[in-house]
Amino acid sequence: MNKITHYFKSLLLLELLGGLWLTLKYTFKPKYTVLYPMEKFPQSPRFRGLHALRRYPNGEERCIACKLCEAVCPALAITIDSAKREDGTRRTTRYDIDLFKCIFCGFCEESCPVDSIVETHILEYHFEKRGENIINKPQLLAIGDRLETEIAERRAADAAFR
């Protein structure tokens, strides 16, 4: 009996007709397409985009060169060099992030004990020349200085979930 049922199903092409019916059904439904450059979806408050380095309110950079972000990065995208200052504290002399390697996982942000490295909401950026994919310390500090108020607001709103 099972062979006869299988024979009639394959003879009538029921699977093919089911697929065609599904296609026909979705042809006349409204589309979910977004015209990207003109229309944009709202971003999540926890969106992880381009990196930034933050400063303290007195202007001193927050990074203490503990190198936890470099150690925890699964893609090995962060490179840090440090040096001791006259007062005995360590500070970074080189802080590079290779955006081609970075997978934007957020581990660097989570591991930072002083909230120095953060991921901003910036989604759209481009590179015109070879080597621009590596963001250095002055560029990261400039991004952080430009977006500090927004970074502080987002971190305060997300503080209950951290």
Swiss-Prot record:
Comment on bound cofactor: Binds 2 [4Fe-4S] clusters per subunit.
EC number per UniProt: 7.1.1.-
Residue numbers binding [4Fe-4S] cluster 1: C63, C66, C69, C112
Listed SUPFAM superfamilies: 4Fe-4S ferredoxins
Locations listed in the record: Cell inner membrane
Keyword Protease: no
GO biological process: one example: aerobic respiration
GO MF entry, a single one: 4 iron, 4 sulfur cluster binding
All copies of domain 4Fe-4S ferredoxin-type, residue ranges: 53-83, 93-122
Broad class of enzyme this protein falls into: translocase
Keyword presence, DNA-binding: no
One GO location term (cellular component): plasma membrane
Catalytic activity: a quinone + NADH + 5 H(+)(in) = a quinol + NAD(+) + 4 H(+)(out)
Pfam families on file: Fer4_7
Matching PANTHER family: NADH DEHYDROGENASE [UBIQUINONE] IRON-SULFUR PROTEIN 8, MITOCHONDRIAL, NADH DEHYDROGENASE UBIQUINONE IRON-SULFUR PROTEIN 8, MITOCHONDRIAL
Assigned protein family: Belongs to the complex I 23 kDa subunit family.
Assembly and interaction partners: NDH-1 is composed of 14 different subunits. Subunits NuoA, H, J, K, L, M, N constitute the membrane sector of the complex.
HAMAP family, per database record: NDH1_NuoI
Protein role: NDH-1 shuttles electrons from NADH, via FMN and iron-sulfur (Fe-S) centers, to quinones in the respiratory chain. The immediate electron acceptor for the enzyme in this species is believed to be ubiquinone. Couples the redox reaction to proton translocation (for every two electrons transferred, four hydrogen ions are translocated across the cytoplasmic membrane), and thus conserves the redox energy in a proton gradient.
Protein name according to UniProt: NADH-quinone oxidoreductase subunit I
Annotated source species: Xanthomonas oryzae pv. oryzae (strain MAFF 311018)
